[in-house]
Amino acid sequence: MLVRFLRATGLIALAIAAAFGPVPAGAQDAHEHTPAVSGVPQGVPYFCARPSVTSVASGAWSDPGTWSTRRVPAENDKVKIAGGHEVTVDVVSDATLDCIQVDGDLRFATDTTTKVRVGNLMVMDRGRLEIGSEAAPVSPTVTAEIVIADRPIDRALDPVQIGTGIEGLGKITMHGSVKTPTFLRLASEPLAGATTLVVDQPVSGWKPGDRLVIPDTRQLRSSERGVSFKSQDEKVQIASIAGNRIALVAALRYDHKGARSADGALELLPHIGNVTRNVVIRSDNPQGTRGHMIFMSRADVDLRYVEVQDMGRTRMGVLDNSDVDSSGRLVKFGTNQIGRYAIHFHHDFGPTDTPANGYHFTLVGNAVDGAPKWGITVHNSHYGLVRDNVVYNTHGAGIVTEDGTESFNVFDHNFALRSEGSGDFAPRSGYGGAAPDPGGEGAGFWFRGPNNYIRHNVAANADAFGFGLAAGSLDVVQIPAFKGADTSRRAETVPLDTTSAAVLEFSDNEAYGAMQAGVSWGWNGTITDLRVWHSSRHGLTGTPADRLIVDRVTIRGDRSLLDSQVENPAGIWLSNYTAKTILVRDANVQGMRTGIASPFYQGLRSAEPGRGDGSVAVERGYFRNYVGISIATAYTASAEAGAAIKTAVVRDSVFKTLDVPVDPLNPPAAISMNHQMAPGDPDPRAPIVVSGFNAKSGDDFKVYYSLAAPAGVAPCDETRPGIGGWVCR
């Protein structure tokens, strides 16, 4: 099974081997490193192996008596917090320290403003870094800041570029002042020139000077996608707050319109996110050597209400990792090393004993503002909580699970917006399909595997997808057998066949604005209470492994775009497939060219083998679009003539017309077997079986394909207004 997994995910395996791969015999001794840890077999360099300043007692950072040198650490010092000592940072220092190694406890004062500038801050397995706690967060009247210095990476000591940032093997706790909520929906449309935002609930912890982000909510035309795209998201600043009204320092530059029904009634409004926190981790020079945070092995991480600004070093685009020769000497210094993200859980199994809150790592209420690739990355790390975070201005994706092993993590109520990317529309990309830039299409959320809980999240303004659940070539993966399992030990894992497994939960998520598809889905499972609006290509792109249920989806398009025949957005697009089982129940789709569209091309019919029964069922839907439902059914090839391999049933669904210009070559219809079918297809097609048309009991019939097919395909030649195809009762 493991062999199958490695073969199926060859690109990621090769990339990680290059980034973290084993060092040849003898090379490990060339420099001082930690013992091997999972995912970093060569160990992590001891950046402070030869400290110039060491703590000799517990005490304040500002007290010379705390230090071996009898002076406070200064420019270029290498600082070690010795085991058994608790040192409290109580200063604002602009001295650039080379490194800090924490073997004991390093705490930041919570009642006074603090700042440390350092090249590497490494928390050892028995060390502890604390910047506020749940019981005593950093006071809202002060700030605590760690600035990662812009220093060149030591190519001899650190050829795979783990350094320049925060490297965590021990306990890391950061609790800034609480902001509630971290993002929320507006109560009125924010239009260009407005100097006040009206929100739908009170805010707590927000204050003048805070930075807010507002997504681009347009439904893009075909000509506005890709290289032509110019984002209209905005970052603004609070001037004052009075109740639910937020005054801005400067007026808005753009309209940020909401979604409307086919009748023009305003139904859904955009969100705003607050990206200001009073605990700040940032790069000193975003244009230089940027910092990153990486948590590994048994790191016990709890970050709440922390601002992560201009962090992450891996860039969207082709990866270029460092190479070493058989002696461990550096052959090539990579220019775009994998695995250096703003926040990165890398094979972080968490503490052996589960923390009191039940999660092996916790990210709550944080803000990521600016990353050259991914914002929050979970890689072979499990049982975590990612909640109430705002991730803005990333490249590739905002929130990510990296290799598909990630399991039992809860992604709850996060807001990811403005994720730039390649714009490649590759719904089944994974690592193999998007080579050599995995997760680079531009997604708010990009989940490599199915084994997580995804609920109450919002994605906006992403180049490709709001949510990308990319199956690709993933097959069998090893997942933890229990909480706290070390998945580098085979005995502590169990296999998961991802082609059979269902996504654990995908409910109450929303995607909108300046994106091609709200959700790109590549797994089994159930999508519940999804809202998508102003997606330019599809609301939901479904390429299910075998079985998919879509319950209570709401999709809204900008009807004005349909004035152009070039624009062809679909509410739900079920890609070419054969043996799949798909149920769409209680859908409400308005303002699109097609409500539900599903093609079928004989030449591709075996491209996605599956274990379903080949059916599409639509039940109790409401459709007000140019075409309500267009499904291309099919029979098998002549050797199996008569056995349907793709069928469609529409039950108790309501269809209404949409007042937009008519294309005489493709007339509007409630249900169509003719709309954009493959011309000249010689095989007969199974009919669409309709019962309770327009929710009227007894109005039952079948719709047969009537165009570009041999004479005699349909058993009848009746027609009916609003139906594209022959109608038989």
Labelled PLM ranges:
Residues 31-38, 76-186, 204-206, 210-240, ...:
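Extracellular beta-helix/beta-solenoid repeat scaffolds
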Residues 52-83, 202-211:
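Acidic Gly/Asp/Thr-rich repetitive segments characteristic of extracellular carbohydrate-active
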Residues 82, 90, 103, 109, ...:
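Feature marks extracellular polysaccharide-active and adherence modules
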Residues 61, 97-100, 123, 129-131, ...:
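All-beta strand scaffolds that present successive hydrophobic residues in beta-strands
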Residues 28-69:
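Right-handed parallel beta-helix/beta-solenoid
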Residues 1-11:
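Bacterial N-terminal signal peptides that target proteins for export
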Residues 9-21:
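Bacterial N-terminal signal peptides
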Residues 134-162, 179-186, 275-286, 308-365, ...:
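Acidic/polar low-complexity surface segments
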